[in-house]
């Protein structure tokens, strides 16, 4: 064995071992537990595919899937619309462009739980007080089973817009100026310019952002943990939160392992 191959193995094997221990092995154990009635502690029995069949008849599980996909779709649309508008503005010829880009990226580097608890205080105390001063009821949006999900969308969008904006700016900077010059000769301005020239050329970046947003929002957990903890009346219970809450403290480790396998 030559020195180059030995070095390659010395670098690769520890990484693969760590990946197997902290990623692959828990995945395998989760799949195994999904065929049991394991409660997270003590003994357990094999139940076959009963956990999987019960998942399709459990109303709470179905409700969490509907909520998660609704949240993911709405948040993905909101984030991409806002990100694209911001990217177009920050890519134009304006003063302090670099400083503004840095400022808009700040939310992305903050912890999701920290942001969630800050917005929790805002929605619970500050916003109701302002609404009361304006003559409204002043009820917290987080206490409404009808509107609490909107607060989660707002927090998710506020924190996610930054990264998507950067990706869109990267896409806009790949568009040659010659294209715009040729388009202006043909009378393309404003909306026509964006629709016929800009958007088709940044379509790959749009696709990337849509996929990343959908993936991230389908796994939403931190914001729900900080804002609503799945309430009120389980109206904002995402799949990830349901798996965590009922699996860890609800004695449904095996059942929720099956849920996690299906969701995976």
Where are these regions (language model features)?
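A structural signal for multi-pass alpha-helical bundles of membrane permease subunits
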Residues: 3-264
């Amino acid at each position: 064995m030559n020195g180059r191959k030995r070095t390659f193995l010395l670098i690769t094997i520890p990484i693969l071992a760590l990946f197997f221990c902290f990623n692959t092995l828990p995945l395998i154990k989760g799949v195994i537990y999904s065929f049991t009635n394991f409660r997270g502690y003590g003994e357990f029995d094999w139940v076959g595919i009963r956990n999987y069949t019960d998942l399709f008849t459990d109303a709470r599980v179905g409700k969490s899937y509907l909520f998660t996909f609704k949240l993911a779709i709405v948040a993905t649309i909101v984030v991409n619309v806002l990100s694209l508008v911001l990217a177009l503005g920050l890519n134009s010829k304006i003063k302090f462009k670099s400083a503004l880009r840095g400022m808009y990226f700040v939310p992305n580097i903050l912890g999701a739980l920290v942001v969630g608890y800050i917005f929790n205080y805002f929605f619970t105390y500050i916003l109701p007080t302002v609404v009361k001063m304006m003559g409204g009821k002043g009820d917290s949006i987080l206490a409404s089973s009808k509107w609490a999900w909107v607060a989660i969308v707002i927090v998710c969008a506020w924190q996610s817009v930054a990264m998507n904006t950067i990706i869109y700016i990267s896409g806009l900077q790949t568009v040659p100026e010659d294209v715009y010059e040729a388009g202006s000769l043909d009378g393309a301005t404003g909306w026509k310019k964006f629709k016929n020239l800009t958007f088709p050329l940044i379509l790959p970046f749009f696709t990337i952002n849509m996929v990343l947003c959908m993936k991230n929002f389908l796994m939403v957990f931190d914001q729900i943990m900080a804002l609503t903890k799945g309430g009120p009346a389980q109206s904002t219970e995402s799949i990830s939160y349901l798996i965590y809450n009922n699996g860890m403290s609800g004695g449904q480790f095996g059942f929720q392992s099956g849920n996690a396998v299906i969701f995976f």
